């Protein structure tokens, strides 16, 4: 089924409001806001689709996902794309023939954030099904490692929307914290929306790093919180086989039925997240332009500093997020996808004033100066990040990270600290 036109709606959990229409013709993508949405005054994409009663035109080949960033943010990354591609392949549609509009229609009402798309290829019934984490994890890992060719019906529904490369699923957590249901749609009262990431490596679930991937991200979030960064609630779930998976509470779903609009730097700036397309100077400017609030600028600076000291080089444009509150105000979302991760050629996806491999403290201080952050505040933030990362060894021991893997990461963190601040 092909589509030349997709309707975009805003779903706050109570009512769906028309936002606009997306169309494609002769290699161009066209977008028009609904006039009532323009009158409402809520800016969803202020830099590339500012509110106006006009037709926006884009050359589809010049857009990172052949869609305006407002809609491209709804598309998943590696894992969700894998599930989506396998679905269309079973319908006889080759990967290269899947249109962006078909992908949006496949997401339908179940995209992350508050946007939904019509017509939808999804069933309108939002069935709640009990989930066994171990069973779902095994299926997800087998698909991820190529041992099965397609996701089952339930995994396709709860695993096809989230972004990121790792296998994951949307779940609803019961008040008792031990029972789970499918979490793509609304949940019963008392339940909460979570995203569970299944620990796995590309080689084997028995590889050491793969088995502890979720635990290591859980540790990174604890260190980020200690560095003064806003983090989502997270917990570790045992699947019964000795592998722990990290579950993160969804910040775009603050209650069983409510939804918040989310956006990334990639979508807001039309920056390709597959390439090293941004600098932290860009993100600091974005924080001020979008929020006019120095608190968010300082928070963005904290994240830049922490990503450097913790060795999170997978800091691409989709890993910097924003939320739109119920009053139409923007703010940074809680941090996500923060862990020990490599980048292109050993560099950060997001550079520090053009330096991606070995930024040092002088660059961090200059970055702060350009963002009108006082040197004393910058040094305090740098010190807090260093102190937080220094707790890794104790946290890793507490969480049962094997000594060999722990020492390997400790060595990497020490090398980064020496590179940034100089050997002592």
Feature annotation, model-predicted:
Residues 1-317, 321-424:
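Phosphate/dinucleotide-binding and metal-coordinating scaffold of catalytic cores
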């Amino acid at each position: 089924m092909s589509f030349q036109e997709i309707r975009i709606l805003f779903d706050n959990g109570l009512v769906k409001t028309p936002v606009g229409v997306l169309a494609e013709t002769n290699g161009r993508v066209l977008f028009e806001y609904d006039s009532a949405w323009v009158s409402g005054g809520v800016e969803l994409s202020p830099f590339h689709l500012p509110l106006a009663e006009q037709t926006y035109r884009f050359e589809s080949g010049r857009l990172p996902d052949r869609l305006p960033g407002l809609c491209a943010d709804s598309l998943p990354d590696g894992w969700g794309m894998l599930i989506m591609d396998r679905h269309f392949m079973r319908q006889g549609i080759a990967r290269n023939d899947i249109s962006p509009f078909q992908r949006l229609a496949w997401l339908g009402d179940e995209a992350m954030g508050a946007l939904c798309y019509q017509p939808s290829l999804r069933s309108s019934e939002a069935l709640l099904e009990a989930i066994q984490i171990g069973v779902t994890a095994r299926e997800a890992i087998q698909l991820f490692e190529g041992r099965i060719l397609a996701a089952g019906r339930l995994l396709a529904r709860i695993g096809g929307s989230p972004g990121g490369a790792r296998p994951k699923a949307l779940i609803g957590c019961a008040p008792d914290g031990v029972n789970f249901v499918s979490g793509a749609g609304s949940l019963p009262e008392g339940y909460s929306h979570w995203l569970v990431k299944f620990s796995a490596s590309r080689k084997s679930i028995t590889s050491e790093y793969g088995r502890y991937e979720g635990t290591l991200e859980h540790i990174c979030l604890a260190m980020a919180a200690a560095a003064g960064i806003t983090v989502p609630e997270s917990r570790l779930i045992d699947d019964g086989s000795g592998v722990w998976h990290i579950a993160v509470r969804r910040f775009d779903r603050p209650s069983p039925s409510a939804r918040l609009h989310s956006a990334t730097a990639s979508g807001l700036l039309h920056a390709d997240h597959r390439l090293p397309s941004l600098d932290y100077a860009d993100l600091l400017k974005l924080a001020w332009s979008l929020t006019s609030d120095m608190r968010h600028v300082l928070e963005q600076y904290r994240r830049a500093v922490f990503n450097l000291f913790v060795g999170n080089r997978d800091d691409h444009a989709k890993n910097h997020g924003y939320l739109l509150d119920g009053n139409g105000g923007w703010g940074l979302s809680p941090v996500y996808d923060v862990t020990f991760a490599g980048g292109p050629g050993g560099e950060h996806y997001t550079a520090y004033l053009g330096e991606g491999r070995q930024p040092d403290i002088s660059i961090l201080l200059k970055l702060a100066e350009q963002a009108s952050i006082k040197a004393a505040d910058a040094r305090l933030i740098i010190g807090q990040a260093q102190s937080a990362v220094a707790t890794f060894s104790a946290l890793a021991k507490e969480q049962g990270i094997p000594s060999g893997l722990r020492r390997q990461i400790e060595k990497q963190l020490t090398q980064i600290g020496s590179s940034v601040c100089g050997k002592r």
